[in-house]
Design a protein with these regions (language model features):
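Active-site hotspot residues in diverse enzymes, especially metal/ion-binding acidic/histidine motifs
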Residues: 1-378
Length: 378
């Protein structure tokens, strides 16, 4: 591949991701818009000075501009609306997956996907969720405490990306491209409960819809999304246990009851409401009823990104006087992938990779990589 065919698409992809027009990027890099256009089309190869200027303007490294991106083909990345950073997310996923797979092979730590026998199953989402829990060693009444650790220990690779977008929650990659792998958007404005749900939702796609993984497909398939939602809901809240908890909390107000059950299963309040509607316990107006009762108690309605704090364990009353200070009921430490970091540490200690390569794989500046390595203990 000619240099221009690598640099041009990389510059364009990063520019779109940074939401910069050609005119703005050209001005920041000190070149004309016409020159930038030629670079992006691959008609001109920028000189070193221009290359570094473009990298600075794009908040990237020169290596980011000259390194070819291995395209993913068997990937599911769909959204109801266009995600401008789509190509950059796919590029970052490709680079991460390539490094991850290489490390596993070099260290002899490749893992078999424990749920491979369930891929392509025709079972209903709820039944498949029960079988998946069993296959991962999760008891029928056991809550899922560490979803990242559970999935990574059983052969799934996980990448946590922080993208300032409420249009992108996650994607999944098939085995043909180095997967199965999941990518979850851990932007701070998305609740931890949503991160957890997204991970299991994408697992559902891998088990049920792998034959539909196609990079070229960008529009959501409503039926497949609903199936993945049902799978995630029943994986995190098995119906039998949910029924018991819902019945036992029957003396609480509707809102308090939802919050208590939400806290037990570590899911969003919306997941509980969907289950109530799906199971026929309540009708299609369940969300309107919840919002109306919440407003009477808290003095405000919940916005799209709000995830109110649930009742503390063993608590039967909610402190409505502090409702304005509600935050996520789970912290970011409830959703941490750490297998790649462990592989990087082992590779460093065995001198398989350099500190610079370790920083590159973990997407850390060298100073932060040195600090991290300095904190490692036995």
């Amino acid at each position: 591949m000619a240099p221009g065919e690598i640099i041009g698409p990389n510059v364009t992809r990063l520019r779109v991701d940074r939401e910069l027009s050609q005119a703005v990027l050209a001005e920041r890099a000190g070149i004309s818009r016409i020159s930038l256009g030629k670079i992006e089309r691959g008609e001109t190869i920028p000189r070193a000075k221009t290359l570094f200027a473009l990298a600075r303007a794009l908040r990237a490294s020169a290596a980011d501009l000259v390194t070819p991106v291995e395209p993913l083909s068997r990937v599911r990345f769909r959204a109801a609306r266009r995600v401008n950073s789509r190509e950059q997310i796919l590029a970052e996923t490709s680079a991460w997956l390539s490094a991850y797979s290489w490390l596993e092979k070099e260290l002899g730590q490749e893992r078999h996907f424990k749920l491979q026998d369930l891929v392509g199953s025709s079972a209903a989402p709820a039944e498949l969720a029960a079988r998946a829990r069993e296959g991962l060693g999760v008891g029928p009444r056991e809550p899922v405490r560490d979803i990242c650790g559970l999935l990574e220990d059983n052969g799934l690779k996980m990448l946590l990306l922080e993208k300032a977008s409420d249009l992108f929650f996650g994607l999944s990659v098939g085995p043909a491209d180095g997967g199965p792998a999941l990518v979850v958007n851990t932007w701070e404005r998305i609740s931890v409960e949503r991160w957890i749900f997204t991970a299991v939702h994408e697992l559902g796609h891998i088990l049920m819809h792998l034959d539909a993984f196609d990079r070229r497909q960008t529009d959501e398939n409503v039926d497949e999304e609903r199936q993945a939602d049902r799978f995630a809901s029943h994986f995190l809240m098995p119906e039998g246990v949910f029924e018991d908890e819902w019945r036992e909390s029957g003396g609480l107000s509707f809102v308090e009851r939802v919050f208590k059950v939400k806290r037990i299963f570590r899911v969003s309040y919306k997941t509980v409401l969907y289950r109530l509607r799906e199971s026929g316990r309540m009708g299609s107006d369940v969300f309107a009823i919840f919002q109306a009762q919440y407003k009477r108690l808290a003095g405000r309605t919940l916005k799209k990104v709000d995830e109110p704090q649930a009742l503390a364990e063993g608590e039967f009353r909610f402190n409505w006087s502090s409702a304005a200070e509600l935050g996520d009921s789970l912290s970011k430490y409830d959703f941490v992938e750490d297998r790649l970091s462990r592989l990087v540490r082992e590779a460093l200690e065995k001198e398989v990779i350099s500190l610079g390569r370790a920083a590159e794989i973990l997407a850390l500046p060298m100073t932060e990589m040195r600090e991290l390595a300095g904190t490692w203990v036995q």
